[in-house]
């Protein structure tokens, strides 16, 4: 079926763009924003409003498919594409992408996604990850609408996957309101929590003291508020700050994490981004050493790779090297939804945990599509998004998941009746 027309509409994303380099360098908070000058190219201030561009494909059958172009909160660092400002890219979409979309005969998602994600701009470079992300979302939605099926079923059929009809564990993030938002997560029985946003050495504390105190508080809070059968996974994102407070001494970090694991037991413990060693090569070596050191200590702490692990090629390098027990597949950073699917499947095939993440700075559209990718590919966990308020993102993603599972179950029963 052909695409008759395309519209590009500027909108808002679910959070903000933050200059991580400036924050790590000591930018002082000022209400909800930060004082000081930005350090990362493309930023006009340390924190600025998140933006999105909706791509709407008008199909011959009258259906309208939608995908949202968005980028991560911490854009422009650790090998990522620059900060995504809508006004800078709508003209590119109109002049360079739209002529290729209008009249395109859309049959299968994989074929279309491969074609459009490999397009290059006038300088011969692949388009910004945000453009590829939004475009492939819209293409997936379009193929589902053409076939009158769910996006999860499109992925399963085209990639030869079995739909298990089981929910994927959801991982919510607290932001700086790590106490209030943890309460919300406990009351709503979030599977993996709380993220914590330990993105500054002062938050993590000298030799991890503040992180330990918070983890112990969280354990007790779950006993106080949680149901007796509620045992969530503890997942803390420390943005390399353990490296800062331990002077990148990986042995000391491993010892600290092994002790922390004992203190939070019986909750499983996952630590994302324990160090940021400044380059992909050093990061791979460091995370590999740290995970192996933990194993020798008899620890089951899972190290989660994030920084420097951005695109499909990066993810394969981290997985092949054993650099951590889990990789975050940060959806906007990979660009195409097709690459996201392949990344999850590759990690699972190699025995590495696949954390299908993303960013608080996404939208309801991209979050719902991530749910379908998750149901089809079966990662270890899905990040709750967009926003940092817990309830909104959890409502969007949990409800989309449960609705889709109900549809899939009904479709399965109907199919069984037909063949029976």
From Swiss-Prot:
<comment type="subunit">
    <text>Homodimer.</text>
</comment>
<feature type="active site" description="Proton acceptor">
    <location>
        <position position="330"/>
    </location>
</feature>
<protein>
    <recommendedName>
        <fullName>Methylaspartate ammonia-lyase 1</fullName>
        <ecNumber>4.3.1.2</ecNumber>
    </recommendedName>
</protein>
<dbReference type="GO" id="GO:0019553">
    <property type="term" value="P:glutamate catabolic process via L-citramalate"/>
</dbReference>
<dbReference type="InterPro" id="IPR022662">
    <property type="entry name" value="MeAsp_NH4-lyase_C"/>
</dbReference>
<feature type="site" description="Transition state stabilizer">
    <location>
        <position position="195"/>
    </location>
</feature>
<comment type="function">
    <text>Involved in the methylaspartate cycle. Catalyzes the formation of the alpha,beta-unsaturated bond by the reversible anti elimination of ammonia from L-threo-beta-methylaspartate (L-threo-(2S,3S)-3-methylaspartate) to give mesaconate. It can also catalyze the amination of fumarate and ethylfumarate, and the deamination of hydroxylamine, hydrazine, methylamine and ethylamine.</text>
</comment>
<feature type="binding site">
    <location>
        <position position="173"/>
    </location>
    <ligand>
        <name>(2S,3S)-3-methyl-L-aspartate</name>
    </ligand>
</feature>
<dbReference type="Pfam" id="PF05034">
    <property type="entry name" value="MAAL_N"/>
</dbReference>
<keyword id="KW-0479">Metal-binding</keyword>
<dbReference type="GO" id="GO:0050096">
    <property type="term" value="F:methylaspartate ammonia-lyase activity"/>
</dbReference>
<dbReference type="InterPro" id="IPR036849">
    <property type="entry name" value="Enolase-like_C_sf"/>
</dbReference>
<feature type="binding site">
    <location>
        <position position="237"/>
    </location>
    <ligand>
        <name>Mg(2+)</name>
    </ligand>
</feature>
<dbReference type="Pfam" id="PF07476">
    <property type="entry name" value="MAAL_C"/>
</dbReference>
<comment type="similarity">
    <text>Belongs to the methylaspartate ammonia-lyase family.</text>
</comment>
<feature type="binding site">
    <location>
        <begin position="359"/>
        <end position="360"/>
    </location>
    <ligand>
        <name>(2S,3S)-3-methyl-L-aspartate</name>
    </ligand>
</feature>
<dbReference type="GO" id="GO:0046872">
    <property type="term" value="F:metal ion binding"/>
</dbReference>
<feature type="binding site">
    <location>
        <position position="272"/>
    </location>
    <ligand>
        <name>Mg(2+)</name>
    </ligand>
</feature>
<dbReference type="InterPro" id="IPR006395">
    <property type="entry name" value="Me_Asp_am_lyase"/>
</dbReference>
<feature type="binding site">
    <location>
        <position position="306"/>
    </location>
    <ligand>
        <name>Mg(2+)</name>
    </ligand>
</feature>
<dbReference type="InterPro" id="IPR029017">
    <property type="entry name" value="Enolase-like_N"/>
</dbReference>
<keyword id="KW-0460">Magnesium</keyword>
<comment type="pathway">
    <text>Amino-acid degradation; L-glutamate degradation via mesaconate pathway; acetate and pyruvate from L-glutamate: step 2/4.</text>
</comment>
<keyword id="KW-0456">Lyase</keyword>
<feature type="binding site">
    <location>
        <position position="328"/>
    </location>
    <ligand>
        <name>(2S,3S)-3-methyl-L-aspartate</name>
    </ligand>
</feature>
<dbReference type="InterPro" id="IPR022665">
    <property type="entry name" value="MeAsp_NH4-lyase_N"/>
</dbReference>
């Amino acid at each position: 079926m052909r695409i008759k027309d395309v519209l590009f509409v500027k909108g808002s994303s679910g959070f903000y763009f933050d200059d991580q380099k400036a924050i790590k360098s000591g930018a002082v908070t000022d209400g909800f924003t930060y004082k000081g000058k930005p350090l990362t190219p493309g930023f006009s201030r340390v924190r600025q409003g998140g933006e999105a561009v909706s791509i709407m494909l008008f199909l011959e059958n009258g259906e309208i498919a939608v995908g949202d172009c968005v980028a991560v909160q911490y854009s422009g660092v650790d090998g990522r594409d620059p900060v995504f400002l809508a006004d800078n890219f709508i003209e590119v979409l109109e002049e360079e992408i739209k002529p290729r979309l209008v009249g395109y005969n859309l049959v299968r998602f994989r074929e279309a996604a491969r074609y459009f994600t490999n397009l290059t701009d006038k300088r011969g470079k692949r388009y910004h990850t945000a453009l590829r992300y939004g475009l492939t979302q819209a293409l997936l939605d379009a193929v589902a609408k053409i076939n009158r099926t769910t996006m999860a079923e499109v992925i399963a059929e085209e990639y030869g996957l079995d739909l298990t009809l089981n929910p994927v564990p959801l991982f919510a993030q607290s932001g700086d309101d790590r106490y209030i938002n943890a309460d919300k997560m406990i009351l709503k029985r979030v599977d993996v929590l709380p993220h914590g946003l330990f993105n500054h050495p002062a938050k993590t504390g000298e030799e991890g003291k503040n992180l330990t105190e918070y983890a112990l508080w969280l354990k007790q809070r779950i006993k106080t508020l949680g149901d007796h059968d509620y045992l969530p996974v503890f997942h803390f994102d420390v943005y390399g700050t353990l490296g800062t407070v331990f002077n990148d001494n990986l042995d000391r970090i491993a010892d600290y994490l092994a002790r922390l694991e004992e203190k939070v037991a019986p909750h499983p413990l996952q630590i994302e981004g324990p160090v940021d060693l400044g380059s992909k090569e050093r990061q791979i070596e460091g995370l590999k050493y740290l995970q192996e050191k933990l194993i020798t200590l008899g620890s089951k702490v899972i190290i989660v790779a994030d920084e420097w692990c951005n695109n499909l090629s990066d993810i394969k390098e981290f997985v092949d090297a054993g650099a951590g027990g889990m990789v975050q597949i940060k959806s906007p950073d990979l660009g195409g939804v097709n690459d996201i699917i392949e990344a999850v499947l590759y990690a699972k095939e190699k025995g590495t945990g696949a954390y299908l993440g993303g960013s608080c700075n996404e939208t309801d559209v991209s979050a719902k599509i991530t749910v379908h990718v998750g149901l089809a590919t079966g990662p270890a966990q899905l990040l709750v998004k967009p926003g940092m308020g817990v309830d909104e993102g959890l409502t969007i993603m949990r409800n989309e998941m449960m609705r889709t599972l109900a549809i899939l179950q009904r479709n399965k029963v109907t199919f069984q009746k037909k063949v029976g």
